[in-house]
């Protein structure tokens, strides 16, 4: 499985990439997409939605299950990935084309408190 070193991770199997200007990009990990199986639909809250850390910001629907998506940080949704209309992109490219939302972060320390790649690998038994 692939777990990029430059990302932060959550116990809910989401990744966070720090962008410019206090924003982060969020998606689900390779482990999560593998566990879910074939993803057929992704729904997220719209741009402008204010989230608190751990708020549900959307759902991922796979052939065998539906999973909630949890905000890894507090902030406001700044962008939603239009490519999610073809939800299978999350299976084929969870870290690049299959990202889900971008958030303008209220408190950068929340990002720093997320798991490193080494910590996340221990969580998933890698």
Curated annotation (Swiss-Prot):
Residues 23-104 form the Lipoyl-binding domain. The glycine cleavage system catalyzes the degradation of glycine. The H protein shuttles the methylamine group of glycine from the P protein to the T protein. The glycine cleavage system is composed of four proteins: P, T, L and H. InterPro entries: 2-oxoA_DH_lipoyl-BS (IPR003016), Biotin_lipoyl (IPR000089), GCV_H (IPR002930), GCV_H/Fam206 (IPR033753), GCV_H_sub (IPR017453), Single_hybrid_motif (IPR011053). Belongs to the GcvH family. Binds 1 lipoyl cofactor covalently. GO terms for cellular component: cytoplasm; glycine cleavage complex. This is Glycine cleavage system H protein. NCBIfam families: gcvH, PRK01202.1. Its cofactor is (R)-lipoate. The keyword Ribosomal protein does not apply. The modification N6-lipoyllysine is found at residue 64. Keywords: Lipoyl. It comes from Chlorobium phaeobacteroides (strain BS1). It comes from the Bacteria. GO terms for biological process: glycine decarboxylation via glycine cleavage system. The keyword Translocase does not apply.
């Amino acid at each position: 499985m692939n777990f990029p070193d430059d990302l932060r991770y959550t116990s809910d199997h989401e990744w966070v990439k720090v962008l410019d200007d206090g924003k982060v990009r969020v998606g689900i990990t390779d482990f999560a997409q593998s566990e879910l199986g074939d993803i057929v639909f992704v729904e997220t809250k719209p741009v402008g939605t204010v989230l608190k850390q751990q708020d549900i910001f959307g759902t991922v629907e796979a052939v065998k299950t539906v999973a909630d998506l949890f905000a890894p940080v507090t902030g406001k949704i700044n962008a939603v990935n239009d490519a999610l209309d073809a939800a299978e992109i999350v299976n084929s490219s969870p870290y690049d084309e299959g990202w889900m939302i971008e958030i303008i972060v209220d408190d950068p320390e929340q990002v720093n408190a997320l798991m490193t790649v080494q910590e996340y690998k221990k969580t998933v038994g890698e």
